[in-house]
Amino acid sequence: GTVVCAGGGIGIAAILPILTALKQAGNKVISVLAGRSKELVIMVDDVRQYSDEVIIMTDDGSYGEKGVVTVGVEKVIQREHVDKVLAIGPPIMMKFTSLLAKKYGIPNDVSLNTIMVDGTGMCGACRLTIGGKTKFVCIDGPEFDGDLVDWDEMFKRMGTFKEIEAKDMAVPNPADKKGSDHSSSSINNVGDEASVDREKSSSIDKNNVSTDEANESEEVWRKALRKELKPKERTAIPRVQMPELDPAYRATTRLEEVNIGLTPEMAMQEAKRCLDCPKPTCVEGCPVGIHIPDFIKHIEHGDFLQAASILKETSALPAVCGRVCPQEKQCESRCIHLKMNSPAVAIGYLERFAADYERESGQMTLPKVAPSTGIKVAVVGSGPSGLSFAGDMVKRGYEVYVFEALHEIGGVLKYGIPEFRLPNRIVDVEIENLRRMGVHFQTDTIVGKTISIDELKEMGFKGIFVGSGAGLPNFMGIEGENSINILSSNEYLTRVNLMDAANPETDTPLIIG
């Protein structure tokens, strides 16, 4: 058929591969290129190569005909049959080209501006109504049927920060002078990264119990520990209460962690409540199978570093899990105390204590890493599942590469959980431990768009774990849902946590009320 391809500004570069494919498929391609002046009409020779006809339009008449792009498009429509119109360029140009095509009953497609902050639909910056349904340009587009686009809504969303941006442009921002802290390497170099010195990175902690003699010694003190208190005495000990920030002070900050953490004395007292069951059902309730009685009894014994070491044998994120895992539905829900109408042992609090103690002591160690298998494994997403999988695989000797769509590693741990619940510095330490163990991280990479699964396979990856997370929010389809400053919980949390939008000095602040 006959296709009119209307390109404006840098949209000409975007439309070139499309018109090329249309021409190669046997279509008649008529290209209408536009700009304010000759200097802004780019890639004309490239477009001519794959077009049956090229019409140039400039606002000032310095190149081709004088007029806007719709003038050139309408001339073509009036002289011959057109089967399709495609427009890529400034939003206002796409809107009126689409309206023109609609006027003549011609199907038309536009390529919308993703106004992308994160490229995953999490920030909501490109959320629009398309055909009465909520869509994200960065995920569902960028090409859409122009007749279905709510253009008024789109222009309102694009102007959300217009006034703020104008003010910022007038005053130099000192932050612009700071260098980026990105250190991720190019995708093309993933297979060529220098291998981590495994002997150094897996320098095993001094406290790791591995010899028969050490095991026998532990069994001796474990037996003695059990005899110190009778089960009834242990169950009679009240469950520890987590110390918290003073409410009056808490109201003045959103970055300081509300739960302060246990003292060593509190942790040892809570550890006494554990009955050291011969068949611990709490372990069955733990998704990663942490040796719960083992690490708790080491806390009761006062050996906090060994408790942390035991945690890291099976968990890649002990400091994180100790804070945000739903222990009340997992390990603690299987605690024997509950059968005796007593509160469960505070397993989560103790896990956090051991991990925090090791970090704050400055004596952090790494778990054992098996000799390299030479097998490369890709992980899609750096949220809790991706990081946990990466930790498990690197300990087994696999070469693990984690691909993250956002600009920071951590997934929901960074964008979805406020810092007063889970500080970023805690997450960063866990990530750094994985990096020291040999895990490679690549940010700003959307698997499926930036790089495909087939390309990963071509790069030598023998296994691919997809931990992309829950993703997009669900919408109810009610009137006003896509109005400006109406945010889903995902969008709100992403902007506040990952983009510091609660700070009015940031690029994309949240202004509510």
Segments predicted by a language model, with ranges:
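Rossmann-like dinucleotide/flavin-binding elements
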Residues: 15, 21, 272, 279, ...
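Ferredoxin-type iron-sulfur electron-transfer modules and their immediate structural context
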Residues: 142, 150-200, 205-373, 424, ...
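Residue-level detector of alpha-helix initiation sites
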Residues: 9-12, 91-92, 122, 316, ...
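Redox-cofactor binding/interface segments in oxidoreductases and associated redox assembly factors
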Residues: 5, 87, 466, 488, ...
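FNR/FR-type flavoprotein reductase catalytic core
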Residues: 1-117
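Short, flexible loop segments at boundaries between secondary-structure elements
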Residues: 107-125, 492-501
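Extended interfacial segments that mediate partner engagement and assembly in macromolecular machines
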Residues: 2-4, 9, 13, 357-396
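N-terminal Rossmann-like dinucleotide/flavin-binding domain of flavoprotein oxidoreductases
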Residues: 308-318, 350, 412-461
